[in-house]
Amino acid sequence: MYDRRAILSGLVLALALPSAARAHHGWTWAEGETFELTGVIQSARLGNPHGILKVMAKGEEWTVEVGQPWRNERAGLKDSMLVKGVELTIQGNRAKDRKLKVMKAARVIIKGKVYSLYPERS
């Protein structure tokens, strides 16, 4: 006979895990207003689950989450464009915790060209 508590616990866990994954990969950790940052790439780690740029802006190092490889490619953004020394502007959403210098990019602007990673976000 199955233990009701074990079944209920399993069901609760199964329902909770997808929301935890969405929270990490979603936008809930970020502010709702658009934030803009201009700086120079110090380093880049591109790939899944998403790329990470370290950007120096006004004397502070920021961590910028860019898209997954398919999202960057769809926007026309190539890995060769996201290398150390490139100056860029990022528009997106910064962390709600203002002590953290972290943001998620919705748009990347290089040499005046806009690469929209999330065209559905204004």
Where are these regions (language model features)?
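Short nucleic-acid-contacting surface segments enriched for D/E, G, S/T with interspersed K/R
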Residues: 74-89
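OB-fold/S1-family single-stranded nucleic acid-binding modules
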Residues: 95-119
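Short boundary/loop segments of OB/S1/cold-shock single-stranded nucleic-acid-binding domains
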Residues: 21-34
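Short aromatic-glycine-enriched beta-strand elements
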Residues: 48-56
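A short macromolecule-binding patch
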Residues: 60-68
